[in-house]
Amino acid sequence: MGEIIDGKKLAKEIQEKVTREVAELVKEGKKPGLAVVLVGDNQASRTYVRNKQKRTEEAGMKSVLIELPENVTEEKLLSVVEELNEDKTIHGILVQLPLPEHISEEKVIDTISYDKDVDGFHPVNVGNLFIGKDSFVPCTPAGIIELIKSTGTQIEGKRAVVIGRSNIVGKPVAQLLLIENATVTIAHSRTKDLPQVAKEADILVVATGLAKFVKKDYIKPGAVVIDVGMDRDENNKLCGDVDFDDVVEEAGFITPVPGGVGPMTITMLLANTLKAAKRIWKMN
């Protein structure tokens, strides 16, 4: 029976560490600030943003929310981002995705100052990650590495398979595993003999967006299984990309959904905001 990796507990520990560090900085008159820009009225995005705000405030940071209507022009959104780039009290900027169709996400991400790009999506940060230079790492991949390490697993020398090749999770998590000296395979919808490829993994990261896609025939006995999915099953119950009940017997360690990767994402956002603030203060 696999051991369950408690993402909530780990997220809480990291957040407490961030909060302590912020408290020390506040004593020196320095307060990290995070601005979130929300366009339109997508309920899922709104809930997620509210959660981010709450956690930012709990950590003792300044939290700013800028809400814009669904029909806002791209020009107006870009000018809001430019203003935040110039704002000395804001150290992290996050534009909540997805954006309405008439706005180019790429253009918006490119406009965020890479020093304040706490999501780690700016091309400069992506490039720095791939050449091994210090950068802001996307929050979910950063959280995944922390979850793997929390099991006591030595990543170096292990076979890791990442199923999914998105720019937000798949590619960056593969790069982070490579930096940790794992031997990495990226698998995707065109991969032949996928169960067989997955079964070679000591560490398996699944980010397919398909409910309960991975079954126990994908799992090497004792593997660390990280489920990035957030789906609904046929009964409308929250589940992941891994069929948890089927896989839990084979896995050595496994993240649950909910309560695995999810809680880590916001925590790593706070860690990135703290890092951004410290960097900006150091430069000035």
Curated annotation (Swiss-Prot):
EC number, as in UniProt: 1.5.1.5, 3.5.4.9
Gene3D superfamilies with a match to the protein in the record: Leucine Dehydrogenase, chain A, domain 1 (3.40.50.10860), NAD(P)-binding Rossmann-like Domain (3.40.50.720)
Stretches that traverse the bilayer: none
Record's keyword annotation contains Oxidoreductase: yes
Key words of the record: Amino-acid biosynthesis, Histidine biosynthesis, Hydrolase, Methionine biosynthesis, Multifunctional enzyme, NADP, One-carbon metabolism, Oxidoreductase, Purine biosynthesis
Catalytic activity, reaction form: (6R)-5,10-methylene-5,6,7,8-tetrahydrofolate + NADP(+) = (6R)-5,10-methenyltetrahydrofolate + NADPH; (6R)-5,10-methenyltetrahydrofolate + H2O = (6R)-10-formyltetrahydrofolate + H(+)
Binding residue positions for NADP(+): 164-166, 189
Cross-referenced Pfam families: THF_DHG_CYH, THF_DHG_CYH_C
Subunit and interaction comment: Homodimer.
HAMAP family linked: THF_DHG_CYH (MF_01576)
Protein name: Bifunctional protein FolD
UniProt source species: Listeria monocytogenes serotype 4b (strain F2365)
Gene (name only): folD
